């Protein structure tokens, strides 16, 4: 089995230079990089992660807990994290918790056993049980990004959800809609309450009475949107516009409407939230509220890297300003 000395000898450089090229820890001239990487390929050299961790007290790995990586919002956040880790020479271990406390506990134990250098927690369901688990890992540098009230344990995502709800609803109103409904997320979550607050604020400013029958609780998943769509379809008095609290629910809602012969935007207008990658390519292209998901992931991992160097690095607030992206899913009634 080839060693780092064999690579250095073949490339005509020092073992230190080989180490810097492989670990991306210092600038090395491009020509030298090519020689080293060619030697690595020729010799089929693979550095020992165990030896490196013993020598340097680092595994060059980061653990990440997310609710569900198949959710397009989290998928795009993860993309930002993974891209940063790759460029920095780190390996990302991704753990889908599904909001399950047992899985959260087991994953935390596994990541601790693998001696990850840091932990990034970005779940939509951070509750006290999870915070208690994380508090027991206080020796591990971590960034906990939370959408809830400020906590001394967590970094805060300030997503200005009230403004997002207000902007979406006002766009409906500006296009002549008064019969406006909402397909919300988990009503116990602060970000959902804030979006609904923005919805109510825009309606009140316009002097429009809110019909509570048109406000339906979803759970950010497609199945809840299908159920909501069927409820709207069954109504004798339907809204002309529906504000969905994420794009996935908006798309499932539109699909169910179309199958029932209810056309979007001709019969009902729809606005989503998040501006996921698929939104411009849906039929019709979805008007939505943009959130900078990749930048959120990149910022979170940057904060974690700072905390790996200094565990007492101050808690941070990451602010996202919602922006309306106008496409083709809202009909102008003016």
Curated annotation (Swiss-Prot):
Q: Which residues bind DNA?
A: 4-23, 48-56
Cysteine disulfide partners in this protein: none
Give the matching InterPro entries. HTH_LacI, LacI/GalR-like_sensor, Lambda_DNA-bd_dom_sf, Peripla_BP_I, Tscrpt_reg_HTH_PurR
**Pathway involvement?**
Purine metabolism; purine nucleotide biosynthesis [regulation]
The protein's matches in SMART domains, at most eight in alphabetical order, are given as: HTH_LACI
Q: Which GO terms describe its biological process?
A: negative regulation of DNA-templated transcription; purine nucleotide biosynthetic process
Every HTH lacI-type domain range? 2-56
Tell me the GO molecular function terms: DNA-binding transcription factor activity; transcription cis-regulatory region binding
Q: How does it assemble?
A: Homodimer.
Q: What domain comment accompanies this record?
A: Consists of two structural and functional domains: an N-terminal DNA-binding domain, approximately the first 60 residues, and a larger C-terminal domain, approximately 280 residues, which imparts the function of corepressor binding and oligomerization.
So what does this one do? Is the main repressor of the genes involved in the de novo synthesis of purine nucleotides, regulating purB, purC, purEK, purF, purHD, purL, purMN and guaBA expression. PurR is allosterically activated to bind its cognate DNA by binding the purine corepressors, hypoxanthine or guanine, thereby effecting transcription repression.
Q: What is this protein called?
A: HTH-type transcriptional repressor PurR
Q: From which organism does this entry originate?
A: Photobacterium profundum (strain SS9)
Q: What is the lineage of its organism?
A: Bacteria, Pseudomonadati, Pseudomonadota, Gammaproteobacteria, Vibrionales
Q: Which gene name does the record give?
A: purR
